[in-house]
Regions:
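Short, solvent-exposed loop/turn segments at the edges of secondary structure
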Residues: 2-4, 65
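A short, structure-level motif marking secondary-structure boundaries and short turns
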Residues: 17-19, 51-52, 87-88
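Long, well-ordered alpha-helical scaffolding segments within enzyme catalytic domains
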Residues: 4-48
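Acidic helix-start/capping segments at beta-turn-to-alpha-helix junctions
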Residues: 46-57
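Cell-envelope/ECM-targeting effectors and their regulatory/trafficking segments
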Residues: 23-41, 55-157
Length: 157
């Protein structure tokens, strides 16, 4: 591609028996990514997965991809919020105005948010959850998602 570099990592995917990525795959991806980031001066926030760009069509690399680990190794971003604090927010429902805030945060992060149907909003939220809250992917905006998105949106100023 003219504006991106793609790294393919072998996996059966969600349709054919989605597998955990091997340590070798992840260490190789980290090594190659760090090389490319340095060589092409890529910002951490611009390290993305297929589903970040095409949430309506793609699920990869998916919830088993260790984005948090990659971030600790200098590849991509992570929210750095204590997971125990976050889990307490998971069951808290949000108001309609907070749903609009969530969509605005997702837009700041770089997700495409124009003309979202209800179905595409669910797909968008699932994509966000696969990357930044892989423990629960339900497509529902809750307080936990809102807090994570708000924190991440501050990294995109």
């Amino acid at each position: 591609n003219k504006y991106s570099i793609g790294i393919e990592i072998s996996n059966k995917g969600h349709q054919f028996g989605y597998e955990k990525f091997s340590k070798l795959q992840i260490s190789s991806a980290i090594h190659l990514s760090r090389y490319l980031i340095k060589k092409y001066k890529i910002k951490k926030k611009n390290v993305l997965g297929h589903s970040d760009i095409a949430f309506d069509r793609k699920k990869d690399p998916g919830e088993k991809f260790p984005w948090e680990l990659l971030s600790r190794k200098g590849v991509g971003i992570w929210h750095e919020i204590n997971s125990e604090k976050l889990k307490k927010l998971r069951k808290k429902k949000i108001h309609k105005t907070e749903e609009k805030k969530m969509i605005n945060f997702l837009k700041k992060i770089g997700y495409y948010t124009k003309n979202l149907s209800k179905i595409n909003l669910v797909k968008l939220v699932k994509s966000f959850q696969r990357r930044f809250r892989p423990e629960l992917i339900n497509g529902k905006i809750d307080k936990e998602c809102l807090v994570i998105a708000q924190k991440l949106s501050k990294l995109y100023r």
